[in-house]
Structure formats: structure tokens, C-alpha cells
Amino acid sequence: MSRTMVIMAGGTGGHVFPGLAVAHRLQADGWNIHWLGTPDRMEADLVPAHGFPIEFINIRGLRNHGLVRKLLAPFQICKAVLQAFMILRRIRPDVVLGMGGYAAGPGGVAAKLLGIPVVLHEQNAAAGLTNRLLAKIATRILMGFEGAFPLTERSRVVGNPVRDEFLQLAQKPLKKYHTGNPLKILIVGGSLGARPLNQIVPHALAKLNNIDVRHQSGKGNASAVSDLYQSLGVTTVTVTEFITDMAAAYEWADLLICRAGALTVAEVAAAGIPAVFVPLPHAVDDHQTRNAESLTRRGAAVLMPQKEMTADKLAELIAQWQVDPRQLQKIAQLSRAAAILDATDRVVSECKALI
């Protein structure tokens, strides 16, 4: 008998890509997969592109909005729960999996009303508002990092599912770091870029010799960032708005400078690449700092808060590694050791156990 799951996730790649990893694994096991999302976020296009049917409900976030929207919020939430209720009653899934995003809240409530097991997965080290509320009614609570929720009989640390190309990368031997080789540095500020990385990192790298640089600048920033490198005399650099094959870029790099989204941290560990994390300072509940600390407290990465990052400080750190690349080798080993490479299988197993 074929089983059915509804995955509730959307808004950002940090929610959608782990959900897709689980979806593909369950589909390979013969499951029917449906998706619940919102029509104006990235899941609307990305999920169908992966071959999964998607249903939409109308719901928006409540943070940082005006009084009128907050006053209307109870009515909008009730409407969204009703929409989700009707969709789930029609699909009749055996279990629902909430991976975060606006649709997960109403979807989880509707599933609970219908008596459908609710599995919750929190990718970040600090749980988001939707998941904190859903945790009260969830059948099972899964965590990417320890500390997002208290460990109880309902909760488990399972890690964050990553894309297959990163799992393949994790099977390859770690790089060997040697003095004298050009240090290959990858800068990733997210798909929309990160202004401090675009502005400060070029000044830091201009103070170094024997480097090769690839820099993802974000949409509309490539020309300005490229011009900045050129004005600073850095010639061994390639600047692009967006890197389509991130796993290949990680495999190329000796060192990564990036933000600390949950998916990024999981992919860094799987790849076994030394990273300097510069957490987004205004992330909700400072969750990026806590994500980064899952590696930095093990010595498996370096944390550099944005307010403390200067060109001189970053250049000095990298120069130390150029003199003694054994430090990078040790960080790479600790990073790979921290990876939970079977996270997708763990999530799948927890979902199957509830049927």
C-alpha cells in the first residue's frame, strides 16, 4: 500500500531544500509526496520544478508589519487553517512534515484537527516563531542542532538534510593543505548578497599574496564588486552574481567566508571545508550566530561577528593560515567530523515510525 506525505515548507531555501531532500528520498521508497506552500514565495516555482504537486494557502508573516495587518491576523490565520484543512482532508496524508515557513503553521494545526501525525523539523539552532507554536501540538520534534528545543521523549537531534551533491562531496577525501600553494578563497554572501562581505572582504584580500578568489556578490552587485577588486589591485578573482553549482565551488575552495544559515552550516560540515562565519546580525533571535557556534565551539570553524570584522583582522587571520596551513587541515577534519551525513535518513525514519 502506497503511503502519502504532505510537506509544509516555504519562503527560503533553508526550509525548501531540506524538504526536497526528504521528498526525493521518500519518493524513491514509493511514497506519494504533496507540498503545502504559499503562492508568492520560492516554493511556488521550485517544488513543481522537482516534480512534486503543490497546494497553496494564503498566509503571510506577522513580524515587522503595521497595526492593521496585526489586527487582521487572527482572521487571516483562521482562513488559512480552513484552507489547509480542506486540502489535507482531500489528500488524506498518513503524516505531515513541517519544515518551516508561513504555510507550516496553519497546515500543522489543520493536520492536528484531522488526527494526522505532525512531524516538525527545526533547521536552526534557535527555533522560529512558527515552530515554537507548532511544537506544542507536534507528534515528533526534530532538530538540526541541539538546543533548538529541550530534549524530551518527543524530540530528537537528527541534523539538517543536505542536497545529494553535498553528500557525494562528503565521500571524497579532505583536501591537503601545503605551504606555498595559492589559497583558494570562496566568498558567499547569500543569493541576495551581503553588503559587508562585498565591501570589507576585498579590502582584506588586497593585503594578501598568493591567493585565488571566487566571490558571489548577489544580484546586481557583480560589476561594483569586480571594480572594487580591480581598484585594489586584486587580479586573481572571479566575481559572479550567483553560483549555480555550489557543491563544485565548495570542492574548489580551500577556505569559505560566508553567512551562517542552517543549510550553509550543514553543507560546510558535509564538505569538510574550513569556514569563517559572519552571521547576519539582524537575523531573528540571532539564530545564525547559534548555528555557527555548533561548529565553532568544536574548533571546526571560525566565528567573526560582523561588528568586529575589519579588513585588517580578516587579513591577519588568513595570513596566519597561509604560514601554517596545518591549522586549516585541522579545521577541515573537525568540520567533517561534526557532519550528520544521514540526516535525511533520520528524518525519513522518524516519519515512517509514526504510521
UniProtKB/Swiss-Prot annotation:
Originating species: Tolumonas auensis (strain DSM 9187 / NBRC 110442 / TA 4)
Compartment(s): Cell inner membrane
Membrane topology: Peripheral membrane protein
Protein task: Cell wall formation. Catalyzes the transfer of a GlcNAc subunit on undecaprenyl-pyrophosphoryl-MurNAc-pentapeptide (lipid intermediate I) to form undecaprenyl-pyrophosphoryl-MurNAc-(pentapeptide)GlcNAc (lipid intermediate II).
GO cellular component labels: plasma membrane
Keyword Cell division part of the UniProt annotation: yes
Keywords: Cell cycle, Cell division, Cell inner membrane, Cell membrane, Cell shape, Cell wall biogenesis/degradation, Glycosyltransferase, Membrane, Peptidoglycan synthesis, Transferase
Entry similarity comment: Belongs to the glycosyltransferase 28 family. MurG subfamily.
EC number, UniProt record: 2.4.1.227
Pfam families assigned to the protein according to its UniProt record, in alphabetical order: Glyco_tran_28_C, Glyco_transf_28
Pathway: Cell wall biogenesis; peptidoglycan biosynthesis
Residues spanning the membrane: none
Protein name: UDP-N-acetylglucosamine--N-acetylmuramyl-(pentapeptide) pyrophosphoryl-undecaprenol N-acetylglucosamine transferase
GO molecular function: UDP-N-acetyl-D-glucosamine:N-acetylmuramoyl-L-alanyl-D-glutamyl-meso-2,6-diaminopimelyl-D-alanyl-D-alanine-diphosphoundecaprenol 4-beta-N-acetylglucosaminlytransferase activity; undecaprenyldiphospho-muramoylpentapeptide beta-N-acetylglucosaminyltransferase activity
UniProt KW Cell cycle keyword: yes
HAMAP family, sorted: MurG
Binding site for UDP-N-acetyl-alpha-D-glucosamine: T12, G13, G14, N124, R163, S191, I243, A262, L263, T264, V265, A266, E267, Q288
Main location per the UniProt record: membrane
An individual GO BP term: regulation of cell shape
Reactions catalysed, as given in the entry: di-trans,octa-cis-undecaprenyl diphospho-N-acetyl-alpha-D-muramoyl-L-alanyl-D-glutamyl-meso-2,6-diaminopimeloyl-D-alanyl-D-alanine + UDP-N-acetyl-alpha-D-glucosamine = di-trans,octa-cis-undecaprenyl diphospho-[N-acetyl-alpha-D-glucosaminyl-(1->4)]-N-acetyl-alpha-D-muramoyl-L-alanyl-D-glutamyl-meso-2,6-diaminopimeloyl-D-alanyl-D-alanine + UDP + H(+)
